[in-house]
């Protein structure tokens, strides 16, 4: 899990 996907857990 990268910080980007953590902001967009879609």
Swiss-Prot record:
Compartment(s): Secreted
Transmembrane feature ranges: none
Keywords associated with the record: Amidation, Secreted
Main location per the UniProt record: secreted
Function: Is not toxic to insects.
Coiled-coil intervals: none
Protein species of origin: Trichonephila clavipes
Classification lineage: Eukaryota, Metazoa, Ecdysozoa, Arthropoda, Chelicerata
Name this polypeptide is given: Fr.III-4
Positions of post-translational Arginine amide modification: 10
Additional note from the record: Has been extracted from the spider web. Is not a smooth muscle agonist.
Any one GO cellular component localisation term in the record: extracellular region
């Amino acid at each position: 899990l990268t910080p980007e996907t953590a902001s967009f857990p879609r």
